[in-house]
Every structure is written in structure tokens, then in C-alpha cells.
Design a protein with these regions (language model features):
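Conserved AdoMet/S-adenosylmethionine-binding subsite of the radical SAM
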Residues: 74, 85-239
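N-terminal pre-triad scaffold of radical SAM enzymes
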Residues: 2-39, 43
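Conserved Radical SAM active-site core
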Residues: 7, 24, 36-121
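Solvent-exposed, flexible loop/coil residues
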Residues: 18, 23-24, 50, 232, ...
Length: 239
């Protein structure tokens, strides 16, 4: 079996974002990313700060650790990053999940196609807005979304930090009007240890985003979400 670079395996917990928000799940966090977003809340996956924590694991080794941690208390696994779409060997992990009746979710920015996208039960494409400092390759994104037409469950999600991000998201929604579309408020404070102080700011920003969306006649078919896990655990890792 091929090896997958793994930084974290944890759970059961709940999914805090996107189309499966609130879903009970286990997490497998992979290392490596082709982006370097300015506000990334998991920069340790690509900035070298956690390079000594990376474990090269086969799909079966990952599955065994998931079972050790979660026992029979889960039937869903979220594959996170970094950008797991960089890793061809994820295909083998998905095969193990399917053999054991486990559903899967994965989020990627839409910069790389993998044939195994079609094997993901809940796939989120999350192109990065202007505040990230990254630039969307719409030719690649068009290619990916065209390939996903046969997929039963996928969506678009954009994290919003400012008005330019919201305009980017609005244009993206109008480019792909048939794709389920989620807006998520961004976390502007990645170092705040006091969850109560962070929660106050998150709620304020969430309310502002709701107000902006309700005032728009171009965003009538979107869902506006918080980053749920930050409401409960703040910036804590491994939850």
C-alpha cells in the first residue's frame, strides 16, 4: 500500500463546517498544501512547524488507529488538511472506508482534480477569496465542477472576511448557480485562548454576514454558516 502523510487522527467529534456541519465524525488530517492562505487556521500542515509530527501511514494503518480511537462510535470520517487532494493514495483509504461501511467527507480548494473525488460521499470545494492572498484558477475549477456533474453530493463553500470576499463569493455563486452554496464567517483571531472572548467576536461577525446576505438580491439560494467548532472549543486543536 502507498503511504499517506498524516498529522492528526482524532475523534469522535462533530464537523464544524460546510455541508455536513454538526455531523458526528472522526478526522484524519493530512500534511501538505499547494496554497498558503494568509488566515489559514491549520498552517502547521504546510509551514514546516509540524514536520516532525508527520507520520507516513498506509490506509490500513489509518483505519486501525481510527478504530482504536473511535471503536464502534462512528460511521463517518472527515479527511482534512492542508489539501488532501494532493495525495493520490487517498483512493486506497476510501476503499477501506467503503469496505467497512464508513461514509467520508473531504474539503479542498479546487486546485487539483483526483478521480477519487467521485468516491467521496460529501465533497466540499472551497475556493479561496481575495483576503487569503491566493488566486483562483477558474479554468481548473470549471474542469473539476464539470467532472463532478455525475456526483451525488458536492457543494461550494467560501469563507468570508470582508466585502471583497463577499463580492467574490457572489460572483462564484452566479458562475455555478446549480451547485449548493455555503458562506462561512471567517475567524479573525487564531491565537485567542479565551473561548468566551473569541465567541463574542465570532457571533458579531456572523451577524454582520447574515445582514449582508439578507440585503442582497444575488444571494437568495445560499446558506450562511458559523464555524461551529470555534463556538465550542475556540482555537483548540484535535477537537
Amino acid at each position: 500500500m502507498k503511504k499517506i502523510p498524516v498529522l492528526e487522527i482524532f475523534g469522535p467529534t462533530i464537523q464544524g463546517e460546510g455541508m455536513v456541519i454538526g455531523r458526528k465524525t472522526m478526522f484524519v488530517r493530512t500534511a501538505g498544501c499547494d496554497y498558503s492562505c494568509s488566515w489559514c487556521d491549520s498552517a502547521f500542515t504546510w509551514d514546516g512547524s509540524a514536520k516532525d509530527d508527520i507520520r507516513m501511514m498506509t490506509a490500513l494503518e489509518i483505519w486501525e488507529e481510527l478504530r482504536e480511537l473511535g471503536g464502534s462510535r462512528f460511521n463517518h470520517v472527515t479527511i482534512s488538511g492542508g489539501n488532501p487532494a494532493l495525495i493520490a493514495a487517498i483512493e486506497e483509504l476510501l476503499a477501506v472506508f467503503h469496505e467497512n461501511g464508513i461514509k467520508s467527507a473531504l474539503e479542498t480548494q479546487g486546485s487539483r482534480w483526483q478521480d477519487w473525488f467521485l468516491d467521496i460521499d460529501e465533497l466540499t470545494l472551497s475556493p479561496k477569496p481575495p483576503s487569503s492572498g491566493m488566486k483562483t484558477d477558474f479554468e481548473k475549477l470549471d474542469f473539476i465542477l464539470n467532472n463532478l456533474k455525475a456526483h451525488n453530493s458536492f457543494s461550494l463553500k467560501v469563507v468570508i472576511f470582508n466585502n471583497k470576499d463577499l463580492e467574490y463569493a457572489t460572483n462564484l455563486h452566479e458562475r455555478y448557480p446549480e451547485v449548493p452554496f455555503f458562506l462561512q464567517v471567517g475567524n479573525t483571531d487564531l491565537v485567542e485562548e479565551d473561548g468566551r472572548g473569541l465567541l463574542k467576536q465570532l457571533i458579531t461577525d456572523y451577524e454582520k454576514l447574515i445582514d449582508a446576505v439578507t440585503e442582497s438580491d444575488r444571494l437568495n439560494n445560499v446558506r450562511v454558516l458559523p464555524q461551529l467548532h470555534t463556538y465550542v472549543w475556540g482555537n483548540k486543536r484535535g477537537v
